[in-house]
């Protein structure tokens, strides 16, 4: 009789899990050591990484660096380096052609260096000397970092530069679009809108949104960077001008009869009937004022924060269709048919100044961002640039074949003029210098006559409205590369825009402070001060700030007689008079010393020189 085997007898023992020899894991940088069988094809070679281990450096091994302050060697941190630079490979197995940090030119480092190493520092205590060594080492490291990060800065604008003898005006937009990157090339586009043209356009203060209105009632607003349409309506009425208000959420449209306010969804919010037959619009962002010029000859200021008419000024010069603002002092410039340009402020009923610019009527006016130069064009086919720093004299003049109907300045001082269907752009030496009218910087021909011009803020883009629609041109060097994120941020969110609106309303500048020279607001008003002092004296009957008369103290033993008191009073008065005379003589000698020539001594024959 067969019996079942006892457990553990004639049965192969189970393998112990702990005693099982596991396969050693292979890392991706280790070589393949598995032997291949006969006839089997070897697999694809694995990416190897011949990175050698860095040997540990002893703690006492320092890099000796000579110091100019003391003979004690400095101990800066040693940068990490591979033993074999050829073995620096990435995960893909490729080798970095430029290992290590990028070299920095010595000239650039010296520009950021704040320590003059040519001067010898005085020897001092050991503690102070060590502090100076550490400060010098930190300063050197900081200057190197600043020089390396200078490549990321964009303060210097990049203009279009041709080769020797090449005229940049012959470079067309297609060549520029082909040469720039994809993101910049997308900023050049054409909107074919011949059905409702001609068009007027306006960019928001942040430069992110574009609004345009056609003469046949077409009004639209969009984010021109992403090409996302915000609103599009037809007001069924002629549109003469269009402007963004303090943000892209509100839009002012000058229609045939009255002024209308819309939001970014195309919903009409207000209809201002006191501003009738408006031809041109300008918005003053720091004062929240919307300036309107009408066919009736009135210049009207509307405070959009409270919805009140601040001032309605009669220019007494007929129809107003040429208007521009000075961004520096918020003064409105109006061009008239008699060839003059008048400067207006809501605080005055008369113009602040009048400038005779042309023999015929003025067709266009533009002021640069610094408020220094003004460009005008007239019916006499002349383009002039005036200096607004008190002289109001023309700096340069150029006669154009057809005359400019529209002018605009960029943030970097470029001047654009629209003449028929041609757009000419002139560039200067810099932001603070006037544009040179000798040779145009760029030239472009459009599909129809120009009806509106404006440079996009913080972008090298020029928007042109014409009878065929809207054209966005690329103009290298036109926009300001650096923007203030707290003032005009193109990338702000909705919450940031709301917070900025509250802050801007709290910091709103009153309309009464608009003047030609804003620096005069920080000066003392001497006339008002003297008038107030005179009124105070009349009200009190005496001058509270007058110096009290001298009263001699009484003395004993007969020395306080009447003659003695009069003598002492006269002595004090004479002393004060002598001080005044001495001070006037010193001032006179100082003036004579300044007027005295520093050259050779004058000759008696100089009076015969003419």
Curated annotation (Swiss-Prot):
SMART domains, A to Z: BING4CT (SM01033), WD40 (SM00320)
Comp. bias intervals (Basic and acidic residues): 7-19, 572-582
Keywords: Nucleus, Phosphoprotein, Repeat, WD repeat
Positions of WD repeats: 193-234, 235-272, 274-312, 315-354, 357-396, 399-436
Cellular localization per UniProt: Nucleus, Nucleolus
Entry protein name: WD repeat-containing protein 46
GO biological process, one term: maturation of SSU-rRNA from tricistronic rRNA transcript (SSU-rRNA, 5.8S rRNA, LSU-rRNA)
Predominant location: nucleus
Organism lineage string: Eukaryota, Metazoa, Chordata, Craniata, Vertebrata
């Amino acid at each position: 009789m067969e019996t079942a085997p006892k457990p553990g007898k004639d049965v192969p023992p189970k393998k112990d899990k702990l005693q099982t020899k596991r396969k050693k894991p292979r890392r991706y940088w280790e070589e393949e050591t598995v032997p291949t069988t006969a006839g089997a094809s070897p697999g694809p070679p694995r990416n190897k990484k011949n990175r050698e281990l860095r040997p540990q450096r002893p703690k006492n091994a320092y890099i000796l660096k000579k110091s100019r302050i003391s003979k004690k060697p400095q101990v800066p941190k040693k940068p990490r380096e591979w033993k074999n630079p050829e073995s620096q490979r990435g995960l893909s197995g490729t080798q970095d052609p430029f290992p290590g940090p990028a070299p920095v030119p010595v000239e650039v480092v010296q520009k950021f260096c704040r320590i003059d190493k040519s001067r010898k520092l005085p020897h001092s205590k050991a503690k102070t000397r060590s502090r100076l060594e550490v400060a010098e080492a930190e300063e050197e490291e900081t200057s190197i970092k600043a020089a390396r990060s200078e490549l990321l800065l964009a303060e210097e604008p990049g203009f279009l530069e041709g080769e020797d003898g090449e005229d940049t005006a012959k470079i067309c937009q297609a060549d520029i679009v082909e040469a720039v990157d994809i993101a910049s090339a997308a900023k050049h586009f054409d909107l074919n809108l011949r059905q409702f043209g001609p068009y007027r356009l306006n960019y928001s203060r942040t430069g992110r949104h574009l609004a345009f209105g056609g003469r046949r009632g077409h009004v639209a607003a969009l984010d021109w960077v992403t090409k996302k349409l915000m609103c599009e309506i037809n007001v069924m009425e002629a549109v003469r001008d269009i402007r963004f208000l303090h943000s892209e959420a509100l839009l002012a449209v000058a229609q045939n009869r009255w002024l209308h306010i819309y939001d970014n969804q195309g919903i009409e919010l207000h209809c201002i009937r006191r501003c009738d037959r408006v031809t041109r619009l300008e918005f003053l962002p720091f004062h929240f004022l919307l300036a309107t010029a009408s066919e009736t000859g009135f210049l009207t200021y509307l405070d959009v924060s409270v919805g009140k008419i601040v001032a309605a000024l009669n220019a007494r010069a007929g129809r107003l269709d040429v208007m521009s603002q000075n961004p520096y002092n918020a003064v409105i410039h109006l061009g008239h048919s008699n060839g003059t340009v008048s400067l207006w402020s809501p605080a005055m009923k008369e113009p602040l100044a009048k400038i005779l610019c042309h023999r015929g009527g003025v067709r266009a006016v533009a002021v640069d961002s610094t408020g220094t130069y003004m460009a005008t064009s007239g019916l006499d086919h002349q383009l002039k640039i005036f200096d607004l720093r008190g002289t109001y004299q023309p700096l340069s003049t150029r006669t154009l074949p057809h005359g400019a109907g529209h002018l605009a300045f960029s943030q970097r001082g470029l001047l654009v003029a629209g003449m028929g269907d041609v757009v000419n752009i002139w560039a200067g030496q810099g932001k603070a210098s006037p544009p040179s009218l000798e040779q145009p910087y760029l030239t472009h021909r459009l599909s129809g006559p120009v009806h509106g011009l404006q440079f996009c803020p913080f972008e090298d883009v020029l928007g042109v409205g014409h009878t065929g629609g809207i054209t966005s041109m690329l103009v290298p060097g036109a926009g300001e590369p650096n923007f203030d994120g707290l003032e005009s941020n193109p990338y702000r969110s909705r919450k940031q825009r709301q917070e900025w609106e509250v802050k801007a309303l709290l910091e709103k500048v009153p309309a009464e402070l608009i003047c030609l020279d804003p620096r005069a607001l920080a000066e003392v008003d001497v006339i008002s001060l003297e008038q107030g002092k005179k009124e105070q004296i009349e009200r009190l009957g005496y001058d509270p700030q007058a110096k009290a008369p001298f009263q001699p103290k009484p003395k004993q033993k007969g020395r306080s007689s009447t003659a003695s008191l009069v003598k002492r009073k006269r002595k004090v008065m004479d002393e004060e008079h002598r001080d005044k005379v001495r001070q006037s003589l010193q001032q006179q000698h100082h003036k004579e010393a300044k007027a005295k020539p520093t050259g050779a001594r004058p000759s008696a024959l100089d009076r015969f020189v003419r």
